[in-house]
Regions:
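Conserved sequence signature across two-component system core domains
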Residues: 13-14, 39, 57
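Active-site residues of response regulator receiver
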Residues: 14, 60, 88
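The feature encodes the CheY-like receiver
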Residues: 19, 64
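Short hydrophobic/Thr-rich beta-strand motif most characteristic of the beta2 strand and flanking loop
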Residues: 32-40, 48
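Acidic catalytic/metal-coordinating carboxylates
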Residues: 41-44, 65-70
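Short amphipathic alpha-helix used as the core "switch/output" element in two-component signaling
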Residues: 47, 69-81
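The short loop immediately C-terminal to the conserved phospho-acceptor aspartate in CheY-like receiver
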Residues: 55-57, 61-62
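Short, flexible helix-to-coil linker/hinge segments that flank and couple to helix-turn-helix
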Residues: 94-101, 105-136
Length: 136
């Protein structure tokens, strides 16, 4: 189990630059969270995860070149120590099931309050699961 004594190093992958910028802004205002890399597609996410070894990868589900589900499977096969938090607009049960079966540690809706997303990042970093309360 990891502790929160040092910054949580986050990779942020979403194909929408405006979404990445907004998430980056509130994550970096939070104590002990640092966005170390950003990707605008799934293949770039895999490359940057391998290169930077983040503590947590935040992935959108629908991205070009590889989906968040595909990237999650890749992480579990190649970078097991990286926590995966899927941050998406999809609240359908089949997506939630597919993401969790792929090995994600958390699933949070983009409509969640920034504090909830920050809490989910911290939960995933410390080895806990993080599920959006609106999905339950």
């Amino acid at each position: 189990m990891k502790t929160q004594t040092s910054s949580i190093r986050v990779l942020l992958a979403d194909d929408h630059a405006v979404v990445r910028a907004g998430i980056r802004q509130f994550l970096e205002q939070a104590e002990n969270i640092q966005v170390i890399a950003e990707a605008d597609d799934g293949e770039m996410a895999k490359t940057l995860i391998a290169e930077h070894q983040p503590d947590v990868a935040i992935l959108d589900i629908q991205m070009p070149k590889a989906t968040g589900i595909e990237v999650t499977r890749w992480v579990r096969a190649n970078q097991r120590e990286v926590g995966v938090l899927v941050l998406t607009a999809y609240d359908d049960a089949p997506y939630v099931t597919a993401v969790l079966q792929a090995g994600a540690n958390g699933y949070v809706l983009k409509t969640a309050a920034p504090r909830e997303i920050i809490r989910a990042v911290r939960d995933v970093h410390t080895g806990n699961s993080a599920l959006d309360a609106n999905l339950l």
